[in-house]
Every structure is written in C-alpha cells, then in structure tokens.
C-alpha cells in the first residue's frame, strides 16, 4: 500500500466524524488567533507599563519580535503550546479504531498490521506538514505586516525553524500514537498523556536538573521541546541558541523512531 492510499484510507474514515473535524478546526483557530493577537497583547502590555519609566523605555525602544530573522523562532516556539491539540486528534484516531472494532475489520479485509500503522503515520506526517505550512504563512503575513526589513535574504534567514516546528509536532504526535496503542481508550490515554507530558516529566526533569545537576536532554518530552528553544531571553541580553541544533534534531528524531517501533511492537504483540 503506497502513501497516497494510506492517506485516502484515513480521509475516508474520518471525513464525516464531527469530533475529529472540530478538534482539527480548533487547532487551526487557536494557532491563527494566537499569532494574530500577539501584537495587540504587546500593545496592551506597553500601555499597562507606562508608569514604569525604565521598563517602558526598554519596551518602546523596540523588541524585534516580528522582525524577519527573529520571527521564525519566536512563532515556532509560541506555536508549540498548541501541539497537544493535534496530539489529541491522533489519540482519538487510534483509540476509535479499537472502540469501534474497525482495526479488526481492516485486518480481516486484508490490511496488514504494518499497513495499518503506516496509515496512522501518514496522518501524522500530513498534520505535521500542514502545521509547518500554517506557521510559514502566519510568519510571512506578520513579518510583511510589522517587520521593518523585508528583503528576500532576511525573510528566509532562520526559515529552518519552520521545518524544526514540523519535526517537533511529528515526534510529539508519534509519542501520542504510542500512548494510544498502549492504553487503547481515548479518555484514559488523553488524561495520562496530558499528565505525563505537561506535568510529570517537566516537574521531574526540573528537580533532576536544578537540585541534582543531572543532564535531562534524553527525556522524551525534554528532547522534543529542545528542537525549538525558548527565544525570548535574548531581549533581556541573555544568551540563547538562535538556530536549530543538529544534536537536538537527532535526539528527538531517535525518540520518534522509538515511538514508531514500540507502536508496531504493541500492534504485533496484542490481540485485536
């Protein structure tokens, strides 16, 4: 089964499933709304700080948040906040196969377990690519609207953060897919996945890093989050990585492969 057919298979399964379409629409809406409202929020914040002469002067001197070169990393990091929405989409797409017994029917109809996994991976790839395209279009629009520099070299400098964001979404969705194959029930999977990725691992790595001085780059969520690093400290004259680090890509990519392998292992090992 080729990639086109696996994509078509997923499309026919969920094209009329309203919760799937609602979550997808919510992701696009939140993504665009947050990007388009940043300028208004900054203007509001500036107005609130008018009495603070030092901070007001610093802010009014110009933070190049929307300038080309800076905008790609800034938006890519902000957009990662919403990666849980497509993750829930993937969880639902997998767990629904178990609850409605469609996975068993697909296998009976001649679809191999490998092809079934590829159909889910094709959905992940499509969502990740569309997320990167959405980020590119939003960044291009905001940059052309607010950036004082609009020459072609400046526009495409640091464009690698768009691809990095796509990779971050892809690996995170692979993790969500593994969780869905592991627990098989949508409600349980969403709760446990959210708890681990948003609470348990971040708290654990913070304690290990700052109290015990451990290196935490090998934890899965930490590795995924490191692909696009927090950029805003540079506006307070602190050092930040203003480019995508190859080691971050390799570690996160390795986790993506691990999640795919574990998903396939679970699919092969368990009865349907």
Predicted regions and their residues:
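Aromatic- and glycine-rich beta-strand/loop motifs that create alpha-glucan
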Residues: 1-28
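Membrane-helix interface segments
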Residues: 18-20, 112-114, 118, 154, ...
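Central hydrophobic cores of alpha-helical transmembrane segments
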Residues: 23-28, 189-200, 216-220
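Junction motif at the cytosolic side of a transmembrane helix
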Residues: 251-272
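Transmembrane helix boundary and interhelical loop/hinge segments in multi-pass membrane proteins
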Residues: 90-109, 113-114, 121
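Secretory targeting signals
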Residues: 26-93, 117-184, 198-210, 222-253
């Amino acid at each position: 089964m080729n990639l086109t057919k696996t994509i078509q298979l997923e499309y026919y399964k969920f094209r009329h499933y309203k919760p799937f379409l609602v979550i997808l629409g919510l992701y696009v809406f939140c993504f665009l709304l947050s990007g388009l409202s940043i300028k208004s929020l900054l203007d509001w914040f500036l107005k609130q700080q008018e009495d603070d002469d030092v901070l007001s002067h610093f802010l009014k001197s110009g933070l190049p948040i929307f300038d080309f070169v800076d905008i790609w990393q800034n938006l890519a990091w902000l957009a990662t906040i919403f990666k849980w929405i497509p993750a829930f989409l993937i969880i639902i797409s997998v767990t629904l196969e178990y609850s409605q017994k469609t996975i068993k029917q697909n296998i009976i109809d001649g679809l191999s377990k490998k092809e079934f996994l590829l159909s889910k991976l094709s959905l992940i790839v499509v969502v990740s690519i569309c997320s990167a395209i959405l980020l590119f279009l939003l960044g291009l629009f905001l940059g052309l609207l607010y950036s004082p520099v609009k020459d072609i070299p400046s526009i495409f400098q640091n464009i690698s953060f768009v691809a990095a964001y796509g990779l971050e979404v892809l690996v995170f969705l692979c993790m969500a897919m593994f969780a869905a194959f592991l627990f098989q029930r949508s409600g349980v999977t969403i709760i446990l996945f959210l708890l681990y990725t948003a609470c348990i691992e971040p708290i654990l790595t913070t304690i290990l890093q700052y109290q015990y001085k451990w290196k935490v780059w090998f934890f899965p969520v930490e590795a995924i989050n490191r692909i696009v690093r927090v950029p805003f400290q540079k506006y307070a004259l602190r050092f930040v990585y203003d480019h995508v680090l190859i080691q971050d890509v390799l570690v996160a990519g390795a986790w993506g492969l691990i999640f795919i392998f574990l998903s396939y292992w679970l699919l092969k090992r368990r009865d349907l």
